[in-house]
């Protein structure tokens, strides 16, 4: 179905990615011609992050408090996050688990989306730091401010943002 899947591979490309991360090399996945195939996009991202989850949990637990043996901090950035974190999909991917649990394993989830209201509320509630630009939809504003103290005052600030301005919440 996908040209990138092979019945037999010469090496493990995920292991190569993990070695680059161990060497503190930044990795960017670009889906090229498969970028518009949502099922391929979710399959690859979910497969890769499940392996990352497994490796980081294992490395952190094997470190037994030895900071030098712990895995390097990792930030997983997901653009168009609603594709992975929408309420119907989030439960079937590893991203909800990462948002909830992996900070203690040196992994942070950084989500980017223009429609935060389409992201599962249980995931949004786990996001500690939020950066937002101007939002026009009331439900998107509500989603960004969910669980934030002083949300009423912040709502006014968000409504006054101009193009190219952001608010750190």
Predicted regions: what they are:
Residues 1-97, 163, 167-169:
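P-loop NTPase motor domains
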Residues 96-169:
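Conserved ATP-driven motor cores of ASCE-family P-loop NTPases powering translocation/secretion/packaging/pilus
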